[in-house]
C-alpha cells in the first residue's frame, strides 16, 4: 500500500477516535484529560495501534486506560461506521508517555538554565 495512503488513513482514524472518545463515550472512569497522540494502522488494515496520552495522576491514568480498553469494541464499531475501509481495524490501545517525558526534559532544561543564571551572579 502506498505510504501516503496509509498516512492519510492513520490521520483519519486518529481524528475519528478522538471525536468518539470526546463525544460518545460516557464512562465515569474517564477522569483525566485524554488525547490521541498517534495511530499506526498495519499495512493490511487489520489492526490499529492507538497511542493515548492521559493527563492526571497515575491512578486516574490506569482507570482511564481500563475504561478505554473496555470501550474498544464500541470504538471499533463507530470507526467502522465513520471511516470507509475494506476492513475495520481492531483497536489496540497503548499509553503514550512522550508528552510527559517532554515536559520532564523541559523542566530539567529550565532548572539547568536557572542554575547557570544563578551561578553567574
UniProtKB/Swiss-Prot annotation:
Keywords attached to this Swiss-Prot or TrEMBL record, sorted alphabetically, are: Cytoplasm, Ribosome biogenesis
Q: What is its main location?
A: cytoplasm
Q: Gene3D superfamilies, per this entry?
A: 3.30.300.20
Q: Name one GO cellular component term.
A: cytosol
Q: Give the location in the cell.
A: Cytoplasm
| Family from the record | Belongs to the RbfA family.
Fill in the subunit field for this protein.
Monomer. Binds 30S ribosomal subunits, but not 50S ribosomal subunits or 70S ribosomes.
Name of the protein in its database record: Ribosome-binding factor A
Organism of derivation: Clostridium novyi (strain NT)
Amino acid at each position: 500500500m502506498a505510504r501516503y495512503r496509509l498516512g492519510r488513513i492513520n490521520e483519519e482514524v486518529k481524528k475519528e477516535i478522538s471525536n468518539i472518545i470526546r463525544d460518545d463515550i460516557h464512562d465515569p472512569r474517564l477522569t483525566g484529560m485524554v488525547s490521541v497522540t498517534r495511530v499506526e494502522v498495519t499495512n493490511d488494515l487489520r489492526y490499529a495501534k492507538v497511542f493515548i496520552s492521559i493527563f492526571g495522576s497515575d491512578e486516574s491514568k490506569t482507570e482511564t486506560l481500563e475504561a478505554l480498553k473496555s470501550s474498544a469494541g464500541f470504538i471499533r464499531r463507530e470507526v467502522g461506521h465513520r471511516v470507509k475501509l475494506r476492513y475495520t481495524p481492531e483497536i489496540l490501545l497503548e499509553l503514550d508517555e512522550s508528552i510527559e517525558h517532554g515536559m520532564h526534559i523541559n523542566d530539567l532544561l529550565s532548572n539547568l538554565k536557572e542554575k547557570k543564571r544563578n551561578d553567574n551572579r
